[in-house]
UniProtKB/Swiss-Prot annotation:
This is Crossover junction endodeoxyribonuclease RuvC. The lineage of its organism: Bacteria, Pseudomonadati, Pseudomonadota, Gammaproteobacteria, Vibrionales. Keywords: Cytoplasm, DNA damage, DNA recombination, DNA repair, DNA-binding, Endonuclease, Hydrolase, Magnesium, Metal-binding, Nuclease. Its cofactor is Mg(2+). Its EC number is 3.1.21.10. Belongs to the RuvC family. Pfam families: RuvC (PF02075). Mg(2+) 1 binds at D8, D139. NCBIfam families: ruvC. Mg(2+) 2 binds at E67. It is an enzyme of class 3 (hydrolase).
Length: 173
């Protein structure tokens, strides 16, 4: 049994989702969004770090799963997204959590069955898979998708290897 924290990074809104994996069963523990009130990027990065650290303290996850940066036509947006990811990852590493990264297409495929799914499809499937009473916010649904993707990927790796994947705690690779 493990608790997985999923993160959908963003420089203005960072989504988070927490699930418990017990064998094949996934249980919803919580989700939401960290909304940045700071205007300047350094202040927003500090808010991401503090927010993710608080979530880690509250839920005590065993694993941290985060969406990878995608290549954007706007280089400035991609750089800001990378910095937001870095703030969240540092919070996880400081808590000695193993960090796993997943491409957005892989997360969408794990949740909806297709890598080209839109946000509403991800929301609908996350709601269905976790038996939620209502659709989660889009960024929170993406974060829950990252956690679900890790749970499914981890189960597959364990089945293929016949044992745990051997990730080292607190090591970012």
């Amino acid at each position: 049994m493990s608790i997985i924290l999923g993160i959908d990074p963003g420089s203005r809104i960072t989504g988070y989702g927490v699930i418990r994996q017990n064998g094949r069963h996934l249980q919803y523990l919580g989700s939401g969004c960290i909304r940045m009130s700071e205007k300047e990027l350094p202040g927003r990065l500090k808010q991401i770090y503090a927010g993710v650290s608080e979530i880690i303290t509250q839920f005590q996850p065993d694993v941290f799963a985060i969406e990878q940066v995608f290549m954007s036509k706007n280089a400035d947006s991609a750089l800001k997204l990378g910095q937001a990811r870095g703030s969240a990852i540092v919070a996880a590493v400081n808590a000695d959590l193993p960090v796993y990264e997943y491409a957005a297409r892989l997360i969408k495929q794990a949740v909806t069955g297709t890598g080209g799914a839109d946000k509403s499809q991800v929301q609908h499937m996350v709601m269905s898979m976790l038996k939620l009473p209502a659709k989660p916010q889009a960024d929170a649904a993406d974060a829950l998708g990252a956690a679900i993707c890790h749970a499914n990927t981890n189960k597959t790796l364990i089945a293929l290897a016949g044992k745990a994947t051997g990730a080292r705690r607190g090591r970012y690779r």
